[in-house]
Amino acid sequence: MVAAPFPRGAFIARILRIALRFNTEMRFSNRSPDYVMKEKAIDPRVRIGHVHLKVASLQRALDFYCGVLGFELTQRYGEEAAFVSAGGYHHHIGLNTWESRDAPPPPKGTTGLYHFAILYPTRAALADALRRLMQANVSLAGASDHGVSEALYLSDPDGNGIELYWDRPRELWPRDANWQIEMFTRQLDLENLLSEV
């Protein structure tokens, strides 16, 4: 794979211009902060396409996301950035060290990312992810059955929270008397999950 030059300065400048414009519009808008709720709902086909993470060591992050979780490296920009994906997509996860090389994780009790979630297509695929984690001696922060899904919780080497999960078929989701989804949190039986492998 050939490393492509990455116009980092232009990219960052563009993001800053967008953020400044958005912040200015929000501060000087006559609309109330809840105006978004008065608009029509977002198109239901919209999906979150990728997450981009600041990491302290690009190689350490690639070792985790590609080596442990099994993502494919789709593009690398020297020692500063990389894209990884599943199934040939251009990228599901971006990794960069632009402002974070050798930096510690943010302290607890601050705002920022709580976790991002990676959706597996089947229970067997989630079980295989658990097997990979166990093989690499990666500790879990939690494992839950939410009724609609089964989930594993962990942190990457930079302290970013990750949820690995699969969704049960919609017709099996728990619902109340008014047919509203009724999620819960119960301990996930990891031995039972591993029986899928």
Task: Locate predicted features.
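Acetyl-CoA-dependent GNAT
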Residues: 97-100, 167
